[in-house]
Amino acid sequence: MTRIALGIQYDGAAFSGWQSQPHGNTVQDALESALRQFAGVALPTTVAGRTDAGVHALGQVVHLDTDLVREPFSWVRGTNAFLPPTVAVRWAQEMPEDFHARFSAHRRTYYYALTFGPTRAPLLEDKAGYVMLPPGQSLDVAAMNEAAQVLVGEHDFSSFRAAECQAKSPVKTMYSIEVRGEGEWVFVRIRGSAFLHHMVRNIMGCLVAIGRGRQPVSWMGDVLAARSRVAAAPTFMPDGLYLAEVGYPDAFSLPASPASSSLFRGVFDEHAGL
């Protein structure tokens, strides 16, 4: 039995999230259907991180176990032949038995892309979040970035946890959060050990409230300390959320995430010290 890791990229707008559902309209259903057509047998997959409906992925990782013998690129080419245009396998690699797409991961990076202004941009539908602001007004990016820093470190993130979250513990470690502005765009990069259900979107809801001046910078600390979902802002839209990268120990030698050459990475690399 051989363990294969696959790097997956997808546009989540048309899907009901990652996890398989009876109606079949999920990314996992699309991927496993394509694998079955290519390999001729069912090949269940294990994912690094389940994404919600409407959330995109630049660097999702899954693993599967198989008796089939194929060259790595054969998995890429063969599976992609049966996938819809909104999902693609970017790479494939044979892995040791102790590799696990979820439990071997030690870091996950999310990006959120947000626009603001008096009118929405139709060409960005489903690809970026949007905040309607009157002409001449903007989000206070500096306040958003300052407020976000209280979340860095190991904390109980119950205030940012969905009611239906199945995680055993609300305690997670946040490695870094950066908020950057570019014209009518705001980009947020969040790195952590792991994330609770809706955690990033709930953090975004609070950041937007602060950016609009509806809450002070200090409010983020109050929300965190409350350890109650009702203390935080409403869950923000999924449209601009991207699972950018899943980090593993160097010993596994997995390919670099395509996010490394993306617009998002470029925005943050322009700022010294990031």
Curated annotation (Swiss-Prot):
GO terms for molecular function: RNA binding; tRNA pseudouridine(38-40) synthase activity. It catalyses: uridine(38/39/40) in tRNA = pseudouridine(38/39/40) in tRNA. Keywords: Isomerase, tRNA processing. Substrate binds at Y110. The active site is at D52. Belongs to the tRNA pseudouridine synthase TruA family. Formation of pseudouridine at positions 38, 39 and 40 in the anticodon stem and loop of transfer RNAs. Homodimer. This is tRNA pseudouridine synthase A. It comes from Ralstonia pickettii (strain 12J).
